[in-house]
Amino acid sequence: MKTVTEVAGTSIKTEYFGSLTDRMNKYREDVLDKKPYIDAERAVLATKAYQEHREKPNVLKRAYMLKEILENMTLYIEEESLIAGNQASSNKDAPIFPEYTLEFVLNELDLFEKRDGDVFYITEETKEQLRSIAPFWEKNNLRSRAGVLLPEEVQVYMETGFFGMEGKMNSGDAHLAVNYQKVLEQGLRGFEERVRAAKANLDLTDPASIDKYHFYDSIFIIIDAVKAYANRFVALATELAEKAPTAQRRQELLEIARICAKVPYEPAETFAEAVQSVWFIQCILQIESNGHSLSYGRFDQYMYPYVNADLEAGRETEDSIVERLTNLWIKTITINKVRSQSHTFSSAGSPLYQNVTIGGQTRDKKDAVNPLSYLVLKSVAQTHLPQPNLTVRYHAGLDARFMNECIEVMKLGFGMPAFNNDEIIIPSFIEKGVLEEDAYDYSAIGCVETAVPGKWGYRCTGMSYMNFPKVLLITMNDGIDPASGKRFAPAFGHFKDMKSFEELETAWEKTLRHLTRMSVIVENAIDIALEREVPDILCSALTDDCIGRGKHLKEGGAIYDYISGLQVGIANLSDSLAAIKKLVFEEGRLTPEELWHALETDYAGERGKAIQEMLIEDAPKYGNDDDYADQLVTAAYDIYIDEIAKYPNTRFGRGPIGGIRYSGTSSISANVGQGRGTLATPDGRNAGTPLAEGCSPSHNMDKNGPTSVLKSVAKLPTHEIVGGVLLNQKVNPQTLAKEEDKQKLIALLRTFFNRLHGYHIQYNVVSRETLIDAQLHPEKHRDLIVRVAGYSAFFNVLSRATQDDIIGRTEHTL
């Protein structure tokens, strides 16, 4: 059997972190060798529940749906696993959520296996099962209900996909972490007792109490369903123990049965119980809702008391703890989600964005690194998987030894860990109204986004895409989208008729403010539909203070509720504005008419190519610490930041602190998808090609090394981009081969975070040659993992366009 290191083909010595145990290595191989199939079981059970309970309030209908699924779905315990719990009928299969939509599923039944990337397999039996339930869901789904709420004024944006809202209309809870600490300390019994007391105190003459009454009943149903799910594993593990091939396996299965009889209903007392409790909840949340970015929160903080107690009592060793952690991470990769073909352009690699956060500071502002922080690093290094998404919270006092260990993991070349910076995130949260003690307890929840675990509402990011380069083209074209020919904004003048750069700036501001308002209208309509149609009970029950308020998350039950969209093409906007200002209006080397013609024709012909070369070679570029380009994009971005802050979300004034919007640059792989529909841009980019991702520079436009990139990024209004400022960098593995090189990188990171107040950074440590070879010989690189955006994915499951985008990124040296 090959080891992870041998399959990955990396030159880095993973002996530094040791290897998986034989059984976990086999488990990992079995999971990765398994083809992902479409699974209709959940959809069939959900249909049955919706039909039987169609007259009930939606909160009860949703509760009975989850009960039906958990009590009847297929269960299994893998022969190598120490943990029980599965999302679908088989590992890595993708369940279907018809209450959100069946439309794309039915349209693509015969296409899933033919995709360029994100391939899924499907049997004829599954196709028939899905077709058989389709009539019930035809108009009875979230997508349909959201569609009828959308005002006529925004239909053009939905028809053209301008705001990229498909994922929001097809998806459930996202970008949050429930209160795992409370789950472990109190068990679901503690939540149940609180609900019982809250229901007993209701004044049913108060009209608001009626919805609360049904919400509380739905929580009782859900908790009973979770208990039934766990007890089914008690029976299964006991049955398997009777047929176990060895005495050791028999004892392990009996221990699984004992633990499942206890958690998550009762508090956890050991590390094994804590892991099982967390996994049950993590798994069931992704059975309840078609979401993503459901994250583990500050794992090393709430788990450490159990680790410490077990080590002191001799119940566990460091090796046994690491093995159980690797088991949990392999379990995490079994969770899967199918998206429509068009949606995969923005979420390439079937990512679930399940984040684990370690490090950072305690609530009393001390370094939070503990022995478990190191064991998480070690276990993630051993499993070498794209999930979970590992984030380290950096702060000025971060333990130096721990920082060294983080770089050693990074050298393994699978894009982890990413770093978020306490020095900018905590003050930004406090400025937005988050209590200081909660701000110090934040975690990553998805890619680069952050929130307070167990207290933050639904979807703190991931709302509208705002394609800045396309907005610029619409501005230049007098409010008309050049790609579709449809009017997207009022007419503020055509670029060909402009006499100064100031005219363009004025038109940009008016157009961007208009489109921002339109995005808010779309978001609000979809959020209203989500609130009405698909309340998620377990997720709400485990988030403070939904029980206290008697409201689910989408009604405003969380303590905090902030949301942001995703702004795409930051660098393209910067470079385009710099080229227009310098080459057209300052130097006069191009007329507005010439530039516009070149854009319309995608730089065709000899003159077009010459103009393209001029734009690329002779204009200032973002990413080089050049104030000319950097300040232009900051000023242009500030307009969006100012406008989006004017509009509260649908939970504003209904309980949560916040209820407002802010900006964010976590564009995932939308730079590829959004680029497909964007014509040529004034930075020299060709039509249909990827945009720049996150806040990273355009490919190979950053000529002055990594330090200059960091300085350019730091000029963005980071303290206002609270939804995340995502920076990807790529370095050759040989760059980190020596100890002195590693220390150079650490010094660079500390400078970026301490002095420049950077928000986030992550690295692809892989050579261009390896990536090209993986395209040509995918069978030799099954385990090659790359950082796509704020998440990692297996290179071979990505579409060719996304692979090319990653290959094209600038490769830095230190």
Where are each of the predicted segments found?
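Conserved catalytic cores of very large enzyme subunits
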Residues: 2-216, 252-255, 259, 263-814
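Extended non-globular scaffold/tether segments
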Residues: 217-231
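Secondary-structure-rich domain cores
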Residues: 230-238
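Extended, structured, electrostatic nucleic-acid-contact surfaces
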Residues: 238-239, 307
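A conserved hydrophobic secondary-structure block that centers on an alpha-helix together
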Residues: 240-248
